[in-house]
Regions:
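Conserved Walker A/P-loop ATP-binding site and its immediately adjacent core
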Residues: 1-16, 35
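Structural motif
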Residues: 2, 51-52, 69
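Post-DEXD/H (motif II) to motif III coupling segment of the RecA-like Helicase ATP-binding lobe
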Residues: 5, 67, 73-129
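Amphipathic alpha-helical transducer elements in NTP-driven molecular machines
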Residues: 10, 24, 33-37, 62, ...
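Alpha-helical scaffold elements adjacent to nucleotide-binding pockets in ATP/GTP-utilizing enzyme cores
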Residues: 11-15, 19, 39-42, 68, ...
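Conserved motor-coupling elements within RecA-like helicase/translocase cores
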Residues: 15-51, 59-65
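Short, polar loop motifs at secondary-structure junctions
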Residues: 54-57, 110-111
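Walker B catalytic acidic pair
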Residues: 54-55, 71-73
Length: 129
């Protein structure tokens, strides 16, 4: 589950904890190195089934990826201008295609490209508009 800003992480974590319990890890740049290390290991060892975080969470070492959800997909924060440059939304679509899983792009105000593709049903991505 990707969120565009770190500040949105706590409310999303609360929602997921209430529904799924303690199988959640959080990854973002505001965590200390030790916290990130602990979360990374928890994911890698299979103790976490759900990862919530900002764009860098797309690199979480999940071994059995089942779905990718991108909240507020229209937000430009999913693009990294730092090296290495990447767009987490594009990576999510690539990962979903290669793993044959759905990617859900959610937004009340979708990106115009997303809106167009949803109307045209141009690919297997699920669009929530």
């Amino acid at each position: 589950m990707l969120v565009p800003e770190i500040s949105l992480t706590p409310q999303m974590v609360d929602r997921f904890l209430a529904r799924f319990g303690d199988v959640i890890s959080v990854l973002h740049s505001k965590l200390s190195i030790g916290e990130r290390y602990d979360q990374w290991n928890k994911i890698k060892e299979g103790q976490s089934k759900i990862v919530i975080g900002a764009r860098s969470a797309i690199f979480a070492p999940l071994s059995n990826l089942g779905i990718v959800i991108i909240d507020e997909e229209h937000d430009s924060s999913y693009k990294s201008d730092m090296t290495p440059r990447y767009n987490a939304k594009d990576l999510a679509k690539y990962m979903a295609k290669n793993n044959n899983i759905p990617v859900v792009l959610g937004s009340a105000t979708p990106d115009i490209t997303t809106f167009y593709k949803a109307r045209r049903r141009a690919n297997r991505t699920t669009y929530i508009i």
